[in-house]
Amino acid sequence: KIGEQLTAMWRQIADTFADFDQHVIFEGMNEPRAQGMNYEWSGNAACYAAINYLNQVFVNTIRKDAKGYNAERCLMIPGYAATSSPAGTAAIALPTVDGEAAANIIVSVHSYDPQTFCLQDTQTTFEPEKDGAKINRVFENIKETFLDRGIPVVMGETGATNTNGNHDERAKWAYCVAQNAQRYGVPIVIWDNGNNQTSGGECHAWIRRAVNPKLRSQATSVVYPQVLDALWEGKNSAAWGSALTEVRAEADESILW
C-alpha cells in the first residue's frame, strides 16, 4: 500500500515538473523509518529491505515513460532514516532500471555528529581534535561506501543546536564540517527548523523569520552570522575532492553544475 501511495504521489510530481531542467532534483523520501518503535532510528534488516524497496519504487515511477527531463534527472535516495552510520549506509541497495544500475542516482545522508553537541544540549563545547575525528569518520565512511565506487553523495541535513548561545563553539563545528565536506566532495545542506530557543536541543534556527511588523527590517536575516561565516572559512580551507583519489576527484568535476 505504501508503495502504491508513493507511486501515485511521485507520478504527479514528476509530471508537473517534467519540463524543469536538471536544476530540479527529486528526493524520494525524508528520513523514512519505523516511527514509534524502539528501533526507530537504528532499524533492522526488515527496515533496510523496506526502504530499498521504496527507493526502487520511486526510481521506477520517475524513469518509467519519463517525460521531459525525467529520463536523466538526478534522483536522491536515502537509506533507512537517512542515516550516515556504517551499518545503515552499507545496507543501501542502489536502484536498477532494466536490470542495470540506474543512472544519475545520488545517495542522501543526514549527519549530526557528535549528537550530544549537534542535537542535544548535554555538550556545549566542540573539541576540534576529538569531535573532529568523529566527523571525519562519517565522511571517510561515505568515501569508502559510495564515493570510491563513483556514487555521489549529498549530506541533505546537518547542523548544530544552539545551546545557551554557544556560537563560538558552533563555529568550530561548522568549520570542521565544511572543511571535510570540501575535501571529500560532498555538498551539505544546513537544517533550519525555525526553533529560536536556546535550550532543550534541536534549536536549529538560522534565518530570522520576523512576524512582528516592528521587526520587518530584520526579516530573513541570518541569525548567527559567525557560524555561517565559519562554514565558508572551512570550505575555503581545502580543495574540492582533495581527500579522494585523483581519478575520482576529476570525475566529480563532471557532476558539478
Predicted features, each with a name:
Residues 1, 64-67, 130, 134, ...:
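Context-gated lysine
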Residues 1-2, 34-44, 121-124, 169, ...:
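Surface-exposed, active-site-proximal loop segments in enzymatic domains
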Residues 4-123, 131, 140-161, 183-184:
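Active-site region of glycoside hydrolase catalytic domains
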Residues 165-257:
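Aromatic-rich peripheral "rim/lid" segments of glycoside hydrolase catalytic domains that contact
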